[in-house]
């Protein structure tokens, strides 16, 4: 069934709104998947905070025009599902990677982040991106390390003195 112009405008507006706040994007070929498998993918996407939409390529090109994901424009060929990571940059890649393990027909085509287009070989790298909390924890550990080492060094001086006095006391 053909879409009316109003429906097309609504789809473009919805996708453009989601794209404007997305951190990363992934597109995959879904040919060969059953309805139940696509429903399962959509459910997993909702649970992981990923916006997932099957959208016509021309409408997707209009929606991403003028955004960081405009680089995906030439990669939109064939029946594709568009996934946008909203909260965590690697969420869409993690979703596609886990789904691809169980479904051979599902093929990731491209990934995009910060205006750069990446091929499917970067899926593992994107999936390994830390969450915001993990990145903050790592940063905090890096910032705390010198202070912690300094405190341990200061604490070692009295400990060493006690060991010296104990050794002197044991020798007498």
From Swiss-Prot:
One of its GO terms (molecular function) is large ribosomal subunit rRNA binding. Forms part of the ribosomal stalk, playing a central role in the interaction of the ribosome with GTP-bound translation factors. This is Large ribosomal subunit protein uL10. The gene is rplJ. Belongs to the universal ribosomal protein uL10 family. It comes from the Bacteria. Keywords: Ribonucleoprotein, Ribosomal protein, RNA-binding, rRNA-binding. Part of the ribosomal stalk of the 50S ribosomal subunit. The N-terminus interacts with L11 and the large rRNA to form the base of the stalk. The C-terminus forms an elongated spine to which L12 dimers bind in a sequential fashion forming a multimeric L10(L12)X complex. One of its GO terms (cellular component) is ribosome.
